[in-house]
Amino acid sequence: MRVVVPFSATEPKTRLAPVLDADERRAFARVMLADVLDALDTVGVDPTVLATEAIDLDRPVTVDDRPLDAAINGLLAASDEPVAVVMADLALATPDALDRLFAAEGDVVLAPGRGGGTNAFVARHPDFRVDYHDASIRDHRRIARDAGGTVTEIDSYRLSTDVDEPADLAEVLLHGEGRAADWLRGAGVQLTVADGRTTVERP
């Protein structure tokens, strides 16, 4: 199985701008990537990072500056083996959660995101393709079934939690056990409660 981790190296995580400046967002994105790669290492797979530009990393890196759909679909079309895609901003991903993803049966195994996205998948069907726009989990269910494939979904809080918005940083601080949580604390990002909900602030 080929395991791919897409990584936006150019201007990552712009929606975190209320909390982190551009340099900090780039640094934090790299830290989350490191956490995901560490978890994959523990599972025993050798991932390739699919980056939008060249990055200095002690891992195999493929540079593809096309939009995500085109880049991933190119890999799927060219592969003669199952392909797994795990997003680089899954700062809460653990080896156990990833092992469940990889071990699940089905032509297409999907890990839905909390906002309707698709945070990870395993494609064993040769005709499966991605469409990451809008509520992509619905599209990916349909695409898999239209191709004649069976679909399995992984119910995992840790795989469903991607980091896009400032509120997502609270989840990292509350539940993270890796470098991303440590990085946020070192940057002075703190938990706070506003309107009865836990969020973050940076005094």
From Swiss-Prot:
The entry describes its oligomerization and partners as: Homodimer.
Q: What does this protein do?
A: Guanylyltransferase that catalyzes the activation of (2S)-2-phospholactate (2-PL) as (2S)-lactyl-2-diphospho-5'-guanosine, via the condensation of 2-PL with GTP. It is involved in the biosynthesis of coenzyme F420, a hydride carrier cofactor.
Q: Which GO terms describe its biological process?
A: F420-0 metabolic process
What keywords is this UniProt entry annotated with? GTP-binding, Nucleotide-binding, Nucleotidyltransferase, Transferase
What pathway does the UniProt record associate with this protein? Answer: Cofactor biosynthesis; coenzyme F420 biosynthesis
- What organism does the record attribute this protein to? Halomicrobium mukohataei (strain ATCC 700874 / DSM 12286 / JCM 9738 / NCIMB 13541) (Haloarcula mukohataei)
Spell out the family assignment given in the record's similarity comment.
Belongs to the CofC family.
Which reaction(s) are listed as its catalytic activity?
A: (2S)-2-phospholactate + GTP + H(+) = (2S)-lactyl-2-diphospho-5'-guanosine + diphosphate
What name is this protein filed under? Answer: 2-phospho-L-lactate guanylyltransferase
**In the record, what terms sit under GO molecular function?**
GTP binding; phospholactate guanylyltransferase activity
Record bears the keyword Transcription:
no
- One Pfam family this sequence matches: CofC
